[in-house]
Structures are given as structure tokens and as C-alpha cells.
Amino acid sequence: MDIRGNVHRFVKFYIDGWKHFRDPTMESSYSAVYYWREQMKAMFLYTTSKERQMPYRSSWHTLVIIQATVCFLTMCYGVTESLGDKVQMGRDIAFIIGFFYIAFKIYYFQWYGDELDEVVEALETFHPWAQKGPGAVDYRTAKRWYFTLAFFLASSWLVFLCIFILLLITSPLWVHQQILPLHAAFPFQWHEKSIHPISHAFIYLFQTWNVMYFLTWLVCIEGLSVSIYVEITFAIEVLCLELRHLHQRCHGYEQLRLETNRLVQFHQKIVHILDHTNKVFHGTLIMQMGVNFFLVSLSVLEAMEARKDPKVVAQFAVLMLLALGHLSMWSYFGDLLSQKSLTISEAAYEAYDPIKGSKDVYRDLCLIIRRGQEPLIMRASPFPSFNFINYSAILNQCYGILTFLLKTLD
């Protein structure tokens, strides 16, 4: 596909999202998951076996891995220049942790790209989840809300991404003693502008490209990951709607029995997709929990260490807010998934009518009620699930460690 086609493929989510927002009667043909996948394909970094069979894709994926590896290793080597300066070393470590998170995701989905695509295909196959035909439930309000939420999240991320990239690639112009967007060191001092101006210019462009490409891809994979769980939450809402309108849609015992049997399978399909999703994202969920924990701890520790320097405190305060915001977002959607899943048993109980139905119908509803009492969770076993209760526990743990470290430093 040509460059113009890929650009259109990338911005299509924002174009369709804006049209959808402006026109309440408009219904999107796809979920947000589809659009995020299209953006990753437009960047040539949707790492599935099918994509790798396309011209130049496999070579590009290999080149991306080499770029990420070189960038990460040179950033690690750059720490040797910061030894003795606690603030600079803390800043270097923070960027290394952040870039390691990006590189880990790139490596991880080289292995799990096909399984990720299986989840996406399953969600797109069943979207919008509701049974079609006479008596179909009106799911459009819920669908519009979730799609609009995804659109505004994507738009806000895009704005902040552009601002962050602009600040990062121009930082050598306004940050004292910084000569590259990312502090890094190369052999033979190739990064020193005064000694090797040509190689310095090349490294500057290399880092600028990496910053733009990898951060944009990170937003896409994060958006895809979040949207998958949001789509599962939407499926739960559709299931609840169909349960609550069961007797309005079904007339006669046979039709009722067939429908309750379908709803049992519908519920089981949601559980199966969620289990598969948790399995696919197992490594990344653990990694982002650990990365956020370290970034929050590091930023607070460095801010306390340099508390007499307002500029340094402001830098690490922003870093802390970014880490907390990222963790809060995942905790919110994890909570939303769990809370909505608990309404399944309530909806099934409302569908129970002793006057109508048969023994088979009651058995199906009881099965849904029993299964629905266990909340569906976003989790990477054996670690705790993503919700605000565990989020608070992580913050308390950070506070305890920092208190101990500060007392030790004093």
C-alpha cells in the first residue's frame, strides 16, 4: 500500500470518530479494536505471521528490533557518564525503564502477535454481539458510549503524544548540557557534537525517528490492549440487555429454551475470550505493573533528593503523574470490567419467571447466575488483578519503601 493509503489508514479512526461524535444517529461498522489494529498495520508493525508474509514486512520487523536494541544499549551505556550525579542518573534510569517497556512490548508481540490477532478476530467476528432480527435489543446507546470513549481517549493521547515528542526532540535546545533527545553514549565518542559533528547529527536524527516511531506505536498497542477489554465489557452489557428482555423477545417454551441456551453459550464465549486475552497479555500486564511501580518510586525518591531544585522536582513530578495516570487508566477499565460482569447474575435473576419457561430454561438461567457471581477480572496470574483496590495497595507499598529509603538517606 502507498504512503497516502497508509496515512489514511492511520487517521481513519479520528475521522470516523469525529463523524460519529457529531452525528448521534450514526453507527460505526467496527469497534475501536479494529481501528487500532489498522493503525498498527499502517505502521508496518503488526507482527503476525500473515503480515510477515507481505513484501518487506519481515525485514522491517527485524530492522525495528535492531533499532530498539541499539537505542536501549546506548542509553544504558550513557549511564556511565552520569555516575556521581544522582539527579542525572535518576533521569537516565527513568528513560531506560520507559524505553525498556517499549522494547519489551515489541519483542513480546513478535512471539504473541498471532495470538493477539486471534483475540482481535474473535471480537470483530461477534461485534456488535447482539442477536439480530425481530425483537433485537437496542444496544446502540452502549455501543456509542464505548466508541466515543475510545475516540476521546485516542484523541487526547494523540495530543499529549505530539506535545511530549516535540518537547523531547527539542530538549537539547533548552536543556543545559543535553546534546541529544535521549541521553546516550556511543563508542569513540560519536555522540559528542564538538568532536564528531556529522555522526552527532546522524545520531540526533536516529533518536528523533526512534522517539516518534516507538512512542506512536506504544500508544497504538496500549490503545488496542485497552480497547480489547472495553469491547469485552461492551459484550457483557449486551448480554445483560438480552437477559433482561428475554421474555419480550421469546414467545413459547421452545423459543425460550433455544434462546437461554444461546445466552449460556454467549456468556461462555465472553469468559473464553477474556481468559485468552489475559493469557496473551500476561507478560505485558506484569511488566507494566512493575514499570509503573519503579517509575513512581524513582520519581518520588529523586524529587525528594533534589527538593531544593524546583526544575528537577517538576520534571520528576510530571513523570510520577504519567506513571500514576497510566496505572489509573488500567485500574479503571479493570474495575469497569469486574463491576459490569457482576450485573450478569442480576440480569439473569430478573429474567427468571416461574410462570413462564421450563426446567431446561431454569437450569440455563441458574447456570448463568452461578457463573455470574464470580467477577471477570483483568489479571496476570499470580499477580493481583487491575483495580483501584490493588492500585491503592501498590501506592501504599511505594510509600512504605520510600519512607524507609528516605530515613536511611537522612
Curated annotation (Swiss-Prot):
Provide the transmembrane region boundaries: 60-80, 93-113, 149-169, 223-243, 280-300, 313-333, 386-406
Superkingdom to which the source organism belongs: Eukaryota
InterPro entries cross-referenced by the UniProt entry: 7tm6_olfct_rcpt (IPR004117)
Asked whether the UniProt record includes Membrane among its keywords, one would answer yes
GO:BP terms for this protein?
detection of chemical stimulus involved in sensory perception of smell; signal transduction
* Extracellular side, ranges: 81-92, 170-222, 301-312, 407-410
Membrane topology per the record?
Multi-pass membrane protein
Annotated GO molecular function terms are:
ionotropic olfactory receptor activity; odorant binding; olfactory receptor activity
Provide the membrane-side ranges marked Cytoplasmic in the record. Answer: 1-59, 114-148, 244-279, 334-385
The places in or outside the cell where this protein is found are: Cell membrane
Q: Which UniProt keywords apply?
A: Cell membrane, Membrane, Olfaction, Receptor, Sensory transduction, Transducer, Transmembrane, Transmembrane helix
Q: Which GO terms describe its cellular component?
A: cation channel complex; dendrite membrane; plasma membrane
Tell me how this protein assembles: Interacts with Orco. Complexes exist early in the endomembrane system in olfactory sensory neurons (OSNs), coupling these complexes to the conserved ciliary trafficking pathway.
* Function as written in the Swiss-Prot or TrEMBL entry: Odorant receptor which mediates acceptance or avoidance behavior, depending on its substrates. The odorant receptor repertoire encodes a large collection of odor stimuli that vary widely in identity, intensity, and duration. May form a complex with Orco to form odorant-sensing units, providing sensitive and prolonged odorant signaling and calcium permeability.
Query: Extra notes?
Result: The atypical heteromeric and topological design of the odorant receptors appears to be an insect-specific solution for odor recognition, making the OR/Orco complex an attractive target for the development of highly selective insect repellents to disrupt olfactory-mediated host-seeking behaviors of insect disease vectors. Odor-evoked OR currents are independent of known G-protein-coupled second messenger pathways.
> Which family is annotated?
Belongs to the insect chemoreceptor superfamily. Heteromeric odorant receptor channel (TC 1.A.69) family. Or49a subfamily.
PANTHER family per the UniProt record, alphabetical: ODORANT RECEPTOR (PTHR21137), ODORANT RECEPTOR 19A-RELATED (PTHR21137:SF35)
Q: What is this protein called?
A: Putative odorant receptor 65c
The major lineage groups are: Eukaryota, Metazoa, Ecdysozoa, Arthropoda, Hexapoda
| Gene for this chain | Or65c
